[in-house]
Amino acid sequence: MAYSAEAYLYFPGGYGTLDELFEILTLVQTGKISRLPIILVGAAFWKPLDEFIKQTLLAEKGTISESDLDLYIITDDEDKIVEIVKNAPMRND
């Protein structure tokens, strides 16, 4: 799945969803796969995770860099999602 996608869309879910999300974030962050859109749909669901990433991983622990925050986008805007996916670059890895 990870190597054939041209964008990654995640909807609210459980441990499996979080596992897949962090696997893709890690692969992109470490340059093992091309950077492609990672879209988290459902702002109310994803906001606490986003706050944890910003406050704990970035600010308190320093285990990620500020540029890592640009690896994903959180939105509920369907038109924006369609536009991002339509304009996603083709894979080159």
Task: Please name every model-derived segment.
Residues M1-L71:
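Conserved phosphate- and dinucleotide-binding cores of soluble alpha/beta proteins
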Residues Y3, I64-D93:
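A charged, well-structured terminal subsegment
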